[in-house]
């Protein structure tokens, strides 16, 4: 029941799944969805809620089988307030250029000037859900781009509301978790340490080989300005730029 939702400390997995399904089916109006988003500005999302939201989005996705490529997705939550360029998107081209297969899942920016889809669109990429075109892109360029609203009705439905609110929401957390390809590998950047651990818990049971990163000065990626945490299956480690052979810099 969405009406009692704001007064609860958390909901269980099944309730969270039902809420996302109802959004996709148009059972809530824009004001109700905006209120739901606002709840998570006032309290943290639980592991069960995140898992339920994720399950609902994956159940309703348009599935895409590119498993033969054993691809990686490199993605950040955004919402770190740092006004950087699209570092994870640029990284995808570097990795693909090195010969590794990348399946990038992204959207238009909700809290920033430019999301991954804005960048891709400006560079002439034509968004498609055609599996044959995506496969040809992987074969010829080692990269395929999946514009999120084409593959999930919920993400399409909430996009205008997220943009009008202009604040970081739990959909920032969900986007990186619901790549419809279910890639073999994921490198995920998050905007705070609690979310790093939340992602890590979520992925422990998934079979995905993952790493979640957060720079301690607030970036949702590895930076050269501070130490950064990396969470991987069964371990979490603190790194410095110097450990990777880089000089530290100031913002």
Please give the residue ranges for each predicted region:
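Short beta-strand segments at enzyme active-site cores
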Residues: 32-33, 103-105, 212-213
